[in-house]
Every structure is written in C-alpha cells, then in structure tokens.
C-alpha cells in the first residue's frame, strides 16, 4: 500500500514521500502523461507501468510486509498481489535512491499542463 511504499522511500532516500515524490515531474503522484522530466520522474513512470501490470490487484491499498536483510529490502511472502506490489515498490524506492544526485526541487509540484503526449510502457 502507499503506507509501506512511503516508508520504503524514506528508508532508501531520507526523504518523505509527501511532498518529495507525491507530485514530482510528470509521473510521480496520481496519473501521468508526457515525457519524464528526469531520472527520478522516469522511476515513477516505470513504477506506474509496474502497477499497470497488476490489473487484479489494488497497489495503493493492499498491505504487504517487508524486512531488511543487511540493509536490503526483502519482500516477505504474502499473496501473489502483495508480493508483486512489494516488488514494484522496492524497485521504485531503490531507483529513487540511485537517482538522488539528479533530484531537482524545480520538478516538485510540477504543473500537469506542462506534461504532453503519451508514452507507452
């Protein structure tokens, strides 16, 4: 769920999911269109695509469990949906950490109307 994802993001990046990633660029937050603005926004695009591959799951509300083993995120065994949601969130949180050096405050609260076009997963 968004609760676990937010916790993962904080652990990986040291940033609060809200406001740091809740409306960043064209893809971080609800919906998305256009070309990702930077590597962080691309992480969100890939995360949206990952969720899009889970049509029978509820990624924003389905809870899952994970732990840390030697600093690494390990998704704990749950239902098929829980496992796949956790893996999507894990990949995004790691992607955010790997791209912290290019995170730009100018893309926080980025206006939707500047995001044009369609990008296929």
Swiss-Prot record:
Q: Kindly list the cysteine pairs connected by disulfide bridges.
A: 26-115, 28-44, 43-95, 49-121, 50-88, 57-81, 75-86
Task: Mark the transmembrane ranges.
Answer: none
What EC number(s) has UniProt assigned to this enzyme? 3.1.1.4
Species of the source: Daboia russelii (Russel's viper)
Single GO cellular component annotation?
Answer: extracellular region
Instruction: Give the similarity note.
Output: Belongs to the phospholipase A2 family. Group II subfamily. D49 sub-subfamily.
Q: What is the lineage of its organism?
A: Eukaryota, Metazoa, Chordata, Craniata, Vertebrata
SUPFAM superfamilies given in the database record: Phospholipase A2, PLA2
The identity of this protein, by name, is Basic phospholipase A2 VRV-PL-VIIIa
Record GO biological process:
arachidonate secretion; lipid catabolic process; negative regulation of T cell proliferation; phospholipid metabolic process
């Amino acid at each position: 769920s968004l609760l676990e994802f937010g916790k993962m993001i904080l652990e990986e990046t040291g940033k609060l999911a809200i406001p740091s990633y809740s409306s960043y660029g064209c893809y971080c937050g609800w919906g998305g269109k256009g070309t990702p603005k930077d590597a962080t926004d691309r992480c969100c695009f890939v995360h949206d695509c990952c969720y899009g591959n889970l049509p029978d799951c509820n990624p924003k509300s389905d809870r899952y469990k994970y732990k840390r083993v030697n600093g690494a995120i390990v998704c704990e065994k749950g239902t098929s949906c829980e496992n796949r949601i956790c893996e999507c969130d894990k990949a995004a949180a790691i992607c955010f950490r790997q791209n912290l050096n290019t995170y730009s405050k100018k893309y926080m609260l980025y206006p939707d109307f500047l995001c044009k076009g369609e990008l296929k997963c």
